């Protein structure tokens, strides 16, 4: 039975706030402060979240970062991360493990997220007006601790549908994320 392998942890949807990056989180960008970074300390560690070919990633996993005051209380890898920056939804990590401790790669890079590479995508065209569209559910903004929980899988599906509309060239990956979320919903209704 195929379903035996399904992760038993319930699906959790987390909207996580990250520092803006005009290079789509594929390399360091200097736009956040308007001047060059001084030393390794100030580089936002999320700068490489969507540098999928970075040698630090494996064939199937991408290593990313989000700054949490305290990490979300989730187990396993049945977690969707919806990345949020400057009021916009900018991308997704699917089937993500969230580590309790940040792991340093070198003095510039570290990670606390391990996501499934073929369920991870940055949106060339970002989603804005997210509160008006109901994408934050009842929240007025993403929590000060760096993230908030979204409670309804339908919210994620609605966000992904808009992402596909705005980014048809990323439809394959976005549909895969949707399929995964929808398969989780069927699990819980059995």
Question: What are these model-predicted stretches?
Answer:
Residues 31-133:
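Structured alpha/beta reader/binder surfaces that contact nucleic acids or chromatin modification marks
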Residues 2-43, 102-190:
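Contiguous surface segments at macromolecular interaction interfaces
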């Amino acid at each position: 039975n195929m379903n035996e392998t399904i992760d038993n942890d319930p699906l959790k949807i987390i909207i996580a706030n990250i520092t803006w990056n005009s290079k789509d989180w594929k390399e360091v960008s200097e736009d956040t402060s308007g001047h060059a970074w001084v030393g390794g300390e100030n580089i936002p560690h999320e700068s490489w979240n969507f540098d999928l070919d970075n040698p630090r990633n494996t064939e199937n996993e991408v290593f990313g970062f989000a700054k949490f005051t305290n990490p979300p209380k989730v187990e396993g890898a049945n977690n969707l991360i919806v990345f949020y920056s400057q009021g916009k939804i900018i991308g997704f990590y699917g089937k993500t493990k969230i580590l309790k401790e940040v792991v340093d790669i070198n003095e510039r890079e570290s990670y606390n997220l391990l996501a499934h590479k073929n369920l991870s995508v940055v949106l060339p065209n970002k989603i804005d007006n997210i509160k008006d569209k109901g994408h934050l559910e009842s929240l007025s903004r993403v929590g000060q601790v760096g993230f908030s929980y979204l409670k309804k899988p339908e919210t994620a599906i609605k966000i992904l549908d808009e992402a596909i509309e705005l980014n048809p060239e990323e439809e394959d990956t976005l549909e895969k994320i949707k399929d995964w979320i929808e398969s989780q919903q069927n699990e819980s209704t059995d």
